[in-house]
C-alpha cells in the first residue's frame, strides 16, 4: 500500500446518514446526524445531554493547512501521515486533564476511532481565544515595527524576540467575518480588544456580559493546566488558540464549554525547553512547517500578505512540496503526541474503511 493511500486526505465523502450537507473545514468535516439518530444514540449510549440534543460526527483528516491554504507533496501525497490521529489524541488527553482539574467540559461525547469524535452541537463564541506566554509570531512582527498596543494591551519597551512576556496575555481575534460591529473591520482573524467584546458581547455570541469573565477564566485555567503538563515533559507552551461555545445540559440550562481542539501543534506553538535555554528555538508545532514554506518559496510576501491571496492559493495548488517536508512534520507531530500522551500513536493503514466499519457496526450510522 502506498503512502498516499494511508493518508486520509478527503474526509467529507463518508456514507454517514445526515440531515443536512456535510460541513467541510480546512482539516475537519462535520456530519450533522438526523434527529432520530441523535435521540437513538443519546439513549443507547447514555450520553449526558438533553434527550433532544443535536449530535454530529466530526472526522479529522491528515490535511496540512498553513497560511490559509492546503498543501500537498510529490507522489500524490495530500496530507501528513499520522497527523489527524496525533491531533485528536493530544486534544483527548488535554480534555481528560481539564476534567480531572474540574474545568469546563468539551463538546466531545464519544471517540469511536482515532480520527472520529461524536460531539454535541454547540453555539460558538465568535472569538479566536488566543493566549500568549512569549512574544513571537504576529505580536513580535507588530512590536518590531514599533507598535506598542496589541489587542488593546500596552506592551512595555525593551522586549526581545521570543522572550517570555511579563505576564500571560489574552489577545483575541474575530472568528470568521463579523459585520456591523463598530471599530471592528469586516475581515477574518482581526485583532480585537476586551473593550470591543464588552461593548458588543451579543454580536460575539455571548449570552451575558459576565460570561466574558467566565471565558477568560476558562482560557487562563486551560492554558495553565497544559503549560504545567508540558513543562514536565521538557516543553514550553508558547501560545495557543482556544474556542468556546454554549451547549444545553440535561436540564436544558446553557453552559460554556471548550470546543474544537486544544493544545495541539496545529493550534499552538510548543518549544523544546532545553534548546530554548541554550538560545535555540526548536518548534514542536506547525510553526516549523510555516517557516519551511517561508524559506522554500523565493517571495515569502505572498504567504504573509493577505492582499495576495489569489497568488497564494495558486502557489499551494500548483506546487507539490518535497515529500520530506511532510514527513518531517509527521515526525514532529507523532513525537510531541507521544511525549504528551505517554503512548505511541497507532497509524491506520486504511482509515476510511475502518471508520465506516465502526460507525456501521457499533453506531448504525452508515447509509446503505
Curated annotation (Swiss-Prot):
Gene3D superfamilies: ATP-grasp fold, B domain (3.30.470.20), Phosphorylase Kinase, domain 1 (3.30.200.20). Its EC number is 6.3.2.6. Pathway: Purine metabolism; IMP biosynthesis via de novo pathway; 5-amino-1-(5-phospho-D-ribosyl)imidazole-4-carboxamide from 5-amino-1-(5-phospho-D-ribosyl)imidazole-4-carboxylate: step 1/2. PROSITE patterns: SAICAR_SYNTHETASE_1 (PS01057). It is an enzyme of class 6 (ligase). InterPro entries: SAICAR_synt/ADE2_N, SAICAR_synthase_Vibrio-typ, SAICAR_synthetase_CS. Keywords: ATP-binding, Ligase, Nucleotide-binding, Purine biosynthesis. It catalyses: 5-amino-1-(5-phospho-D-ribosyl)imidazole-4-carboxylate + L-aspartate + ATP = (2S)-2-[5-amino-1-(5-phospho-beta-D-ribosyl)imidazole-4-carboxamido]succinate + ADP + phosphate + 2 H(+). One of its GO terms (molecular function) is ATP binding. GO terms for biological process: 'de novo' IMP biosynthetic process. Belongs to the SAICAR synthetase family. HAMAP family: SAICAR_synth. This is Phosphoribosylaminoimidazole-succinocarboxamide synthase. It comes from Vibrio cholerae serotype O1 (strain ATCC 39315 / El Tor Inaba N16961). The gene is purC.
Amino acid at each position: 500500500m502506498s503512502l498516499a493511500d494511508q493518508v486520509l486526505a478527503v474526509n467529507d465523502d463518508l456514507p454517514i446518514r445526515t440531515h443536512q450537507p456535510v460541513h467541510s473545514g480546512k482539516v475537519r468535516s462535520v456530519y450533522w446526524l438526523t434527529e432520530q439518530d441523535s435521540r437513538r444514540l443519546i439513549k443507547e449510549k447514555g450520553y449526558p445531554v438533553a434527550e433532544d440534543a443535536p449530535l454530529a460526527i466530526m472526522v479529522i483528516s491528515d490535511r496540512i493547512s498553513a497560511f490559509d491554504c492546503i498543501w500537498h507533496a510529490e507522489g500524490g501525497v495530500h496530507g501528513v501521515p499520522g497527523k489527524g490521529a496525533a491531533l485528536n489524541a493530544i486534544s483527548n488527553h488535554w480534555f481528560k486533564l481539564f476534567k480531572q482539574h474540574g474545568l469546563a467540559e468539551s463538546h466531545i461525547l464519544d471517540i469511536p476511532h482515532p480520527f472520529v469524535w461524536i460531539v454535541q452541537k454547540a453555539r460558538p463564541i465568535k472569538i479566536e481565544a488566543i493566549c500568549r506566554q512569549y512574544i513571537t509570531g504576529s505580536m513580535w512582527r507588530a512590536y518590531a515595527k514599533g507598535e506598542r498596543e496589541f489587542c488593546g494591551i500596552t506592551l512595555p519597551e525593551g522586549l526581545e524576540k521570543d522572550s517570555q512576556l511579563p505576564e500571560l496575555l489574552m489577545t483575541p481575534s474575530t472568528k470568521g467575518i463579523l459585520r456591523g460591529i463598530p471599530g471592528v473591520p469586516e475581515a477574518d482573524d482581526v485583532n480585537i480588544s476586551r473593550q470591543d467584546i464588552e461593548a458588543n458581547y451579543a454580536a460575539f455570541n455571548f449570552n451575558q456580559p459576565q460570561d466574558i469573565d467566565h471565558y477568560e477564566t476558562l482560557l487562563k485555567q486551560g492554558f495553565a493546566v497544559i503549560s504545567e503538563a508540558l513543562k514536565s515533559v521538557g516543553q514550553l507552551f508558547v501560545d495557543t488558540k482556544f474556542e468556546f461555545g454554549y451547549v444545553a445540559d440535561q436540564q436544558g440550562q446553557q453552559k460554556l464549554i471548550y470546543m474544537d481542539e486544544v493544545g495541539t501543534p496545529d493550534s499552538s506553538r510548543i518549544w523544546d525547553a532545553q534548546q530554548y535555554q541554550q538560545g535555540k528555538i526548536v518548534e514542536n508545532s506547525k510553526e516549523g512547517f510555516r517557516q519551511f514554506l517561508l524559506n522554500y518559496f523565493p517571495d515569502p510576501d505572498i504567504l504573509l500578505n493577505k492582499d495576495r491571496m489569489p497568488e497564494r492559493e495558486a502557489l499551494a495548488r500548483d506546487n507539490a512540496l518535497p515529500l520530506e517536508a511532510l514527513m518531517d512534520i509527521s515526525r514532529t507531530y507523532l513525537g510531541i503526541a507521544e511525549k504528551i500522551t505517554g503512548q505511541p500513536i497507532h497509524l491506520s493503514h486504511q482509515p476510511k474503511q475502518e471508520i465506516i466499519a465502526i460507525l456501521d457496526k457499533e453506531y448504525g450510522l452508515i447509509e446503505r
